[in-house]
Each structure stands twice: as C-alpha cells, then as structure tokens.
Amino acid sequence: FCLGLAFIGWSHTLYAQTISAAGNEMSFDDPLTVSPSTSVGGFCVYNDVITIGATSYDAIITIDNISNALISDFDVNNTVNSNSSSHFSPSVLWTSANGYITYSIDFIEDGSAGAPVPVTIGDIFLTAWDIDDVGPSGRFISSSGFSGYTLGSNTYLSYASTGLGVGTFQNATSGSNTSGTDGRSRVTLEYSSTNSISLTIGAIGTGPHTYLISGTNPQNWFPTTANESTIPTINTFGSTA
C-alpha cells in the first residue's frame, strides 16, 4: 500500500526527550511505500527501523534535492558487493560532473506515518560502505548534526568540515579498489540526539553507482583499525566542550 498522501505537510519538531538506542542497530529492510517516487519529494516509509526495549520506531526517507543525477532505484534490494536488505541502497546515474542527492531521514513513532509523530533518538549510527575509486570518481557522502565519526587509520577518504558536526567524506585515493566491507573505504557517523538526519551522496565523475548505507556501527575494520573522532559540543555559554 502507499502512504503518499498522508505524509504531506508534516514538519520537523525537535523534542527534548532523547531515547537512547543503547547499542541497538537500525535496519531498512521493511519498506512500506510501494514504488516510491525517485524525484524530489519522493519518499519511502520504513517499518520498525529500530527497536529499543519493547518499542519499535519507524523512519521516513525523503529526497530533498537532486542535481546532475537520475535515481534508477530508490532502494536496491540485492546482495551485490556485500549489500543487504537492511541497507539503504539508492542506485544512481550521475549524468554530469559534481552531482549530488540530499535525503532526510526522519524518525517517527511506530505506525504514525499517516500523521507523523516525531521521536528523538540518540546514540545511533550510519555507515557508508565501499567509497572507493571504482566507478564514478570522487564519490562522497555529507551529513550534518553528527557528534562523531570513525575512519580507518589508513583510510582512502578525506574529511572536510564546514561547521560543527557538518562535513564531507570523499574518496581521495586514485586507483583505490576495495571490497564492499573494506575498512579503508568507509566511514561511520554517530548521532547523539536527533529526530532528523540530513544525508547527501554525490560524485565528481559521471556514471552509475549503488550506494551502500547501513544503520550499524561495525567493529571489524579489516585490513585497518578504527580511528574515532568526537565532535566538540557547544554548551549554553557558547564555549566548546
């Protein structure tokens, strides 16, 4: 069934209470929206993205912006290159240089997609896999509001920060060719408290690619080791901590 009309018009509201994920991972393996639109404004409702204690929460992924790109599949469900149904895996054709697509991931109470009730969840993770140099060059992901990130100690990615908890992770190693699970070509982002995540995928070059994004915090970074970084936070007096 389709939840298209019911979703229109809801707004993001930051609730004070944060529900800690407490080590629970997210999974995008149960989409409820049939044939979601691949144009700006298209969205998919995902059922039971995370369960904390005895309570499950849903998510809505929405396409906010598209530049120099065509989305061939909102979320590919296959096992190519270590993909799985639990990943959010948009398949994209970059039609011109410097293309990008921005998504929002909004967390809501279970079953409330008809009249979304936002929830604020803490201590959650997104991991972008296989950002190597095979396929469109200079592939990247960007996000905002993250409280920390993890890269491999000899990563193939560069990090450019444009603000506190705002930045881009991009393949910076020409010729790098890794498996889908290689720790050198991935990044994990942590969000300490949020009800909406902004996530951008993109590339400098052109051509097709399927992005692999999981709601996990993997511990195995073979053939490298994890290098974690924490983003300073601003307290009420304007200093950083």
PLM features: residue spans?
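Solvent-exposed loop and beta-edge segments used for protein-protein assembly and interaction
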Residues: 95-99, 118-120, 191-193
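Contiguous ligand/interfacial binding patches
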Residues: 18-44, 48-49, 133-232
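N-terminal targeting leaders for non-cytosolic proteins
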Residues: 18-99, 231-240
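Extended extracellular/luminal ectodomain segments enriched in beta-structured repeat modules
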Residues: 112-125
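Bacterial Sec-dependent N-terminal signal peptides
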Residues: 1-18
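A Trp-anchored, charged/polar loop motif used as the substrate-binding/catalytic surface
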Residues: 99-112
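Extracellular beta-rich ligand/substrate-recognition surface
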Residues: 89-101, 173-182
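Residues within well-ordered beta-strands of beta-sheet-rich folds
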Residues: 104-106, 123-129, 198-200
